Each structure stands twice: as C-alpha cells, then as structure tokens.
Amino acid sequence: MPRLARRIYGIENEYGITCTQRGQRRLSPDEVARYLFRRVVSWGRSSNVFLENGARLYLDVGSHPEYATPECDSLSDLVAHDKAGERILESLAHSAEAKMREEGIRGDVFLLKNNTDSAGNSYGCHENYLTVRVDDLTRLVEVLIPFLVSRQIIAGAGKVLLTSRGPLYAVSQRAEHIWEGVSSATTRSRPIINTRDEPHADAERYRRLHVIVGDSNMSQWATYLKVGAMAIVLRLLEEEVVLRDLTLENPIRAIREIAHDTELERTVRLVNGRELTGLEIQEAYFERAERYHERIGLPADEARALDMWREALKALRANDHEALFGKVDWVTKLTLIEAFRARHQLPLSHPQVSLLDLQYHDISRERGLFARLEAKGRVPRIVDDETIERAVDEPPATTRAALRGRFIRAAKEAHRDYTVDWVHLKLNDQAQRTVMLKDPFASEDERVDRLLTSI
C-alpha cells in the first residue's frame, strides 16, 4: 500500500442544544437552533455555510449544530480548529440569548459537546483521514476495527448510563449506538467505519476514511492522542508492517463489553479463539508502533502522539487515574463524579450526577465544568487561547483551506455573491467562474489568484 508523506485530517462535531430558564426547558431544540443560526443566516443566507477560516458550519438533522474543521495537515492545527469550533458556537449562543431577550424570552442557551441526550438519541463526532486509494478495503478494515473498538479506553468521553440492570458508568458515549462494523450509511446503521466514497479530492489517488465511532472530546490532549494514534496505525498499514491478527469475533458486542468496564479487566473474544482485554489490544498496536518508530522513525507530530499513547496505556495498566486527570475525558469525568458523590452521599442514578455529567460538556467558558478546570490550570493543553482565537478567523496556512478562506474573505469584502464547498470555489456572476480544487495539500493556485483578481 503506497504511503502519504503528509496526511489531511478533519473532525466534525455535532452539538447538543437546549434552552432553559431556572432549570426548566424554555424552547424546543428547533426553536433554539433558529435563534442560534439567525446571525449565520443574516450574512450567509443559509444555515449551511463555509467560514473565513475554511470550516463548515451547518444545522444537521435533529436541530444539531455541526462544525466541521477545515482540512488540517498537523495534529496541533487540528486541535486548534476543533477548539475554534467551540468558540464560534459559544459566540453564537451569546448572540441567540441577546436576540431572545430583545423578544422578551429569558433563558440560557446550552451547547453541549457530547454525543447523547437525555432521550437516548445519539449524535456524532466524525473523524476524517486522507488515505491512499486501494482497491481492496478488507485489510484496512480488518486492522482498524479492533483498534477503534478498543481505542475508547484512551479517547472515550465517559457517560452515566441508566440501564434496566441499574446505573453504570460507561467509558464511551457512542459505544451503545454503534450497530455495524462497516457501512456506507451514517445514521441508519451507525457503523464504526463509514465507507461512503466521497474523497473531496482526486478520487483516483485518494480516499477519505470516515470514522464515526469516536466520542467528542473536551480535552485537547485526548483529541490529539485519538487522531494521532489512528494516524500511526494508518502509517503502519501503508508501510505494510506485519500486525498481529486481532480480528474480533463480534466487534459490536466487544465495543459494549469494553465500554461497560471501567476497571478494564473484561475480555473480548477474537476470531482465533483468544480472549484479550481492550487494554491488551491497545498495547499490541502500541508495541508494534513503538518498534516501527525505533527502527524507522515517525514524524514529530506522530512521535509526540506515540509518547502520549505510552503514557496513557502505562497509567491505565497501573490503574493510575490521577496521572490521566485532565487528559483522558472518561477518567477526568469519573474522578469528578466520584468526588461529588462521596461529598454528598449520592447514588450514581441521582439526577444531580446526571447533571454533572452534562455540565462537563458545556462549551461555555463561564459555566462548563471542563472549561473551569482548564481556567484553573488543572488541564494540560496542546494549544493556547491565542492560537485558538487565530483559528477562529484564519484557515490552516498549508492546505486547500487557505485558498477557500482567502476566496470567502475577498468575496464578502467585495459584496460578491459566491458558492463554495470542499472542492469548488464559484463566483455567481454572469460568467459563473468556478475553480475546482482537487488537491487538498495545495495552499497556492494560480487559478484562484486570477479569480481573486477578478473580484
């Protein structure tokens, strides 16, 4: 399998939305979403827009605001742009509250970067990886599914789950809602890997791998590790490194088994009859990656992710949750919940515990539990506030997003009507001039320069 010198990454996060006044629900999610997107519609004439930083912001099915980062070719850029999405939506929430007040509606708009609501509906965090096109996806899928099923132990967001057998704390939010290993649908069957073939690039050379099994992360550290570890495994596949056969007998049962065991001791069965824990599966991938790094070397981004992967697995092996506080979301939230329960003598099923679970994911920097930990310096960061604020306005400089951002900015300043998507830039004038950008790595293009000059 040929390899990529650079890789393109992107993350799409859907957000939960609600509006309450003194704890009571004030507006339906649909009504809140309309207020939230009023500012967007006023300048974009649509609730589906591309922004000057190259990202896409739109209202998804079920009144979920969704932010898709621009194309990033570094993990730290990706973290910055993922966090920029939170800032952009937080700003829209403030505008929505102000507009509601003008119309005599008092209420707080909550945007939650989580994956399930109180009614049991699930919404996603989708990761995108550019890969080299191969004719047969079988090998790719065989290797990736056990990795992704077990990756929740380092990247899960955690959740209090109320089941018929009583409450439990689950490692992953999405695990309950995944029904297939591989599928071309995202909502109906909720697979681990979505195979719908939309590369948003030269289809003869590239494929866009669409992973929909992951949780949304509050922790920058977890986002970096989640995507970084996946990038390393893709590199091993591209380099045709021999990997142990870890094919799971039943991936869907396995993902739930691993999710329901915070001690990480429960085993899952492989096709070859062996039984391994999720931690052992992750360690098997990590050991192969470490050997590759010692022999050949990983790029700096991935080498940093490898160090973080080692740190996470070592702490989980030692059951050292303190070492992962502020880094791994499910561990951080569980630590907060256990302390809260002990202080107030509350059962796991208590509504106050469920409320704390939600508050962890509130993107408001005033209210959000994780945000408050960050403000107190209790959380390690990959990027600082200045970098995030820059990402709110500016696209990554080294990918196609730079061209899209320049075009949008120029067209808006000149009050020109335009249409853009991931691949096309179009001026809606008599000439209907369109530029098609098939290379996601190209941040300069003479055709775009000419289009900008004509504006």
From Swiss-Prot:
Which reaction is recorded as catalysed by this protein?
ATP + [prokaryotic ubiquitin-like protein]-L-glutamate + [protein]-L-lysine = ADP + phosphate + N(6)-([prokaryotic ubiquitin-like protein]-gamma-L-glutamyl)-[protein]-L-lysine
Pathway membership, UniProt: Protein degradation; proteasomal Pup-dependent pathway; Protein modification; protein pupylation
Keywords carried by this UniProt record: ATP-binding, Ligase, Magnesium, Metal-binding, Nucleotide-binding, Ubl conjugation pathway
Pfam families attached here? Pup_ligase
- Please give the Gene Ontology molecular function terms for this protein: ATP binding; ligase activity, forming carbon-nitrogen bonds; magnesium ion binding; ubiquitin-like protein transferase activity
| UniProt GO BP | modification-dependent protein catabolic process; proteasomal protein catabolic process; protein pupylation
Catalytic residue positions: D60
Under Enzyme Commission nomenclature, its number is 6.3.1.19
> What does the entry list as the binding residues for Mg(2+)?
E12, Y58, E66
Q: Which domain of life is it from?
A: Bacteria
Q: What class of enzyme is it?
A: ligase
Detail which positions bind ATP. Answer: R56, T69, W422
What InterPro entries does this protein's entry cite?
A: Pup_ligase (IPR022279), Pup_ligase/deamidase (IPR004347)
Family the entry assigns:
Belongs to the Pup ligase/Pup deamidase family. Pup-conjugating enzyme subfamily.
**Described function:** Catalyzes the covalent attachment of the prokaryotic ubiquitin-like protein modifier Pup to the proteasomal substrate proteins, thereby targeting them for proteasomal degradation. This tagging system is termed pupylation. The ligation reaction involves the side-chain carboxylate of the C-terminal glutamate of Pup and the side-chain amino group of a substrate lysine.
The UniProt record's further free-text remark is: The reaction mechanism probably proceeds via the activation of Pup by phosphorylation of its C-terminal glutamate, which is then subject to nucleophilic attack by the substrate lysine, resulting in an isopeptide bond and the release of phosphate as a good leaving group.
According to UniProt, the name of this protein is Pup--protein ligase
